[in-house]
Every structure is written in C-alpha cells, then in structure tokens.
C-alpha cells in the first residue's frame, strides 16, 4: 500500500470517527422530573410521541421490593434508590452509545428528588446530552391528582415525604446541567409547547 493509500485510509477513519462523535453529541436525553402526581408519565409520553422517540418510565426500573414498600406507605431511603438510579443511568448510557438506532432523542421520567440522585443518573453523561425538566405545582394540586390516580403502587400518603426531601437544583447544578422549570397548573398541550420552546 502506498503512502497515498495510507493517507486516504487514515482520512476515511478520521472522518468516520468524527461523524460518530457528532452523532453522539447530537443525542439528547430529556428527563421529566418531579414528585409523584406532577404528571411525569403523562408529559413524558406526550413529549416522546411528539418527537417520535423512545420513552422509559422510571417505574420500570424499580424492584418489586421497592414497589411493595411504596404500596404499603413506606418511604424509600437512599439505599433503596441506589440500584434503581444506577439502572436508569445504565439505560441512558446505552442509548447514547447506540449509534445504529437512528434516534437522536430519548425521554425518561425520574423523580430525581435530591441533588445526589441527579448526580447518579447523570454519571458519565455529557452536559449537552442531558436536559432536566422539573415539573412544579402546589401541594393541593399534587394531592388531588394522587387521590384520583388509579391502579398505581404509589401510596398518596407518601407525598409529604417526597416534598420534604425535594431539593431544587443548586447553582452548581444549574452550571453543570441544562434545566427547565415548568408549572403543572397549565394544560398538557401548554406544557408540551413550553418544553418544545426549550428544545429549539
């Protein structure tokens, strides 16, 4: 093989690697976060449907033990949540590393109540590959929604425990990640439109 052939081959490899890196950098994970009753699943499904992309609800990653605790009205602790958050992070990284799926976006829901929880799910993920959407509303509205929710393992009596540990993003988090804050008193269509304004 001549030097010219080698140069052409090296250039092809370089271009291919750059293309793969650009594809990876263009991928975006949208995390719909907030306490139970804030509408994470409803909004997450609506966003994923509008984008035509994949969707994962954090409930999929809970162990049966975690679900039973919540069903019984027992709040989860940090140890309960650690493997759950690790599983979500693993799925996120799988999405980012899959260069053959043709998808640039993926929506996840996760309560992500504490700063440390958000650190766990965003571990080894580039800032520009991740957008946190925090759904916020009054305790009264959240409670009403939970009381009206059917066939879900989450005990409405756990709302107070979630609100008590909810940590708004710190200044450091706001510098290291992209955040959007959404008022859930608006309609689903209005919320989706507001989120799309952040995505532009």
Curated annotation (Swiss-Prot):
SUPFAM superfamilies: P-loop containing nucleoside triphosphate hydrolases. InterPro entries: P-loop_NTPase (IPR027417), Shikimate/glucono_kinase (IPR031322), Therm_gnt_kin (IPR006001). Gene3D superfamilies: P-loop containing nucleotide triphosphate hydrolases (3.40.50.300). Its EC number is 2.7.1.12. ATP binds at residues 34-41. Keywords: ATP-binding, Kinase, Nucleotide-binding, Transferase. It holds the Pfam family SKI. One of its GO terms (molecular function) is gluconokinase activity. Pathway: Carbohydrate acid metabolism; D-gluconate degradation. It catalyses: D-gluconate + ATP = 6-phospho-D-gluconate + ADP + H(+). One of its GO terms (biological process) is carbohydrate metabolic process. Belongs to the gluconokinase GntK/GntV family. This is Probable gluconokinase. It comes from Dictyostelium discoideum. The lineage of its organism: Eukaryota, Amoebozoa, Evosea, Eumycetozoa, Dictyostelia.
